[in-house]
């Protein structure tokens, strides 16, 4: 295997020894419609319903040459290109071709591919040189086109966010890279709209305060201005502009997240059986969260299909929580969303909690780290930890939250 990336924690974005390929399929829905209906080729094609209140789902590049873009009202699109051809969405076909493309990349090039959406994904390498990376990206791109007739664009960087940005710069059917030492030359001249995570309000505020290029953000030293213009996202946006996208070591990543995964014994589980497996995995993970006296800021659910494609969805939570029901609802929602795209042919299920911090309502003695608490001598231990262990073991046998602490019942 050329490279693997197996952490469930989505906060990892950069590491000097890592290199990311970010795949973005070009006009994917429109390309699928053209493959299924060859008569649509070489015509301005819009995917969406031809009604005045609808919006453009996506369109091919010929339609884009008229100024049409995703999210545009259909009425406006028809003003720009009255001769446009329409195709209704066929999500089953989109999922089918998406799976084919990702499976081909994984199998042909012996890579572990992580899908982020139906038409975006990434692979991660360790110690791959930029020259070899570019050559490999072109080979992947060419192979997908020759075998399946799809164009994909690829961004390459030692930082995840930069790889994503430059996959968009590479469109259509290109490969572009940007490494840390190239940020001033390649990243700074780009308009700030290219930064992931900037909303319309932030963009308007940015223009009013003379932030037009990414370089304008990078050069700004006024933290107060940054906070006023970009809100809580100012720090991460500034880091991206500097090419310093949240670097951390593998050990740091592991310590800030906990995960439980299970490889399934059989490949023909029913939907109900998969739901039961998910609940069992969640219960084990939740017990670990309780016994570590921590709360989390987000959840990731990961599925590996029979063709070894890794699919994951994550959700950040507004407030830190260690609430069982809150976390279970999020996990099930993410799982069901993934299942719609992947189907029942599942090889592995994984769940993780990320963004961990100490839970102030836990019963651990103040100032004592978890590993110190576990390894403390009997005279130094309190009865709280033993009680938590007992509650955990009973609930493991008879169902979660059958036994709870009185203060938790009072709070609810």
Curated annotation (Swiss-Prot):
One GO cellular component term noted in the UniProt record for this chain: cytosol
Alphabetized GO MF terms: damaged DNA binding; DNA-directed DNA polymerase activity
Gene3D superfamilies: 3.30.70.270, 3.40.1170.60, DNA polymerase, Y-family, little finger domain
Record-annotated UmuC domain positions: 20-199
GO annotation, biological process: error-prone translesion synthesis; SOS response
Top-rank taxon, per record: Bacteria
Coiled coil regions in record: none
Protein family: Belongs to the DNA polymerase type-Y family.
Protein name as catalogued: Uncharacterized protein MG360 homolog
Source species of the chain: Mycoplasma pneumoniae (strain ATCC 29342 / M129 / Subtype 1)
């Amino acid at each position: 295997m050329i490279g693997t990336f197996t952490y469930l924690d989505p906060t990892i974005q950069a590491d000097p020894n890592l290199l990311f390929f970010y795949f973005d399929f070009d006009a994917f829905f429109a390309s699928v419609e053209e493959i299924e209906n060859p008569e649509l080729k070489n015509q301005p094609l819009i995917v969406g319903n031809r009604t005045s209140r609808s919006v453009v789902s996506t369109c091919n590049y010929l339609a884009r040459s008229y100024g049409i873009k995703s999210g545009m009202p259909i009425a406006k699109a028809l003003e720009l290109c009255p001769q446009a051809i329409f195709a209704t969405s066929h999500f089953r076909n989109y999922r089918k071709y998406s799976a084919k493309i990702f499976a081909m990349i994984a199998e042909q090039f012996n890579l572990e591919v992580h899908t982020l959406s139906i038409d975006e994904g990434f692979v991660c390498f360790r110690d791959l040189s930029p020259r070899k990376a570019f050559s490999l990206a072109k080979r992947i791109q060419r192979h997908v086109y020759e075998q399946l007739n799809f164009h994909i664009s690829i961004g390459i960087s030692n930082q995840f966010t930069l790889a994503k940005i430059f996959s968009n710069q590479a469109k259509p059917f290109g490969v572009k890279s940007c490494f840390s030492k190239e940020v001033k030359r390649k990243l700074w001249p780009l308009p700030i709209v290219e930064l992931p995570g900037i909303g319309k309000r932030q963009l308007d505020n940015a223009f009013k305060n003379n932030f037009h290029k990414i370089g304008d953000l990078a050069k700004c030293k006024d933290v107060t201005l940054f906070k006023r213009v970009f809100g809580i996202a100012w720090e991460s946006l500034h880091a991206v502009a500097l090419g310093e996208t949240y670097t951390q070591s593998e050990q740091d990543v592991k310590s800030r997240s906990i995960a439980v995964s299970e490889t399934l014994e059989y490949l023909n589980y029913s939907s109900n059986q998969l739901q039961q497996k998910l609940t069992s995995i969640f219960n084990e993970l939740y017990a670990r969260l309780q016994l570590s006296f921590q709360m989390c800021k987000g959840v990731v659910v990961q599925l590996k299909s029979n063709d070894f494609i890794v699919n994951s969805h994550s959700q950040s939570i507004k407030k830190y929580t260690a609430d069982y029901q809150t976390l279970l609802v999020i996990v099930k929602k993410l799982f069901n969303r993934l299942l719609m795209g992947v189907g029942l042919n599942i090889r592995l299920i994984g769940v993780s909690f990320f963004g961990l911090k100490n839970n102030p309502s836990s019963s651990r003695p103040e100032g004592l780290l978890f590993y110190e608490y576990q390894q403390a001598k009997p005279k130094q231990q309190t009865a709280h930890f033993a009680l938590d262990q007992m509650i955990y073991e009973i609930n493991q046998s008879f169902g979660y939250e059958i036994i709870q602490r009185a203060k938790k019942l009072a709070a609810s």
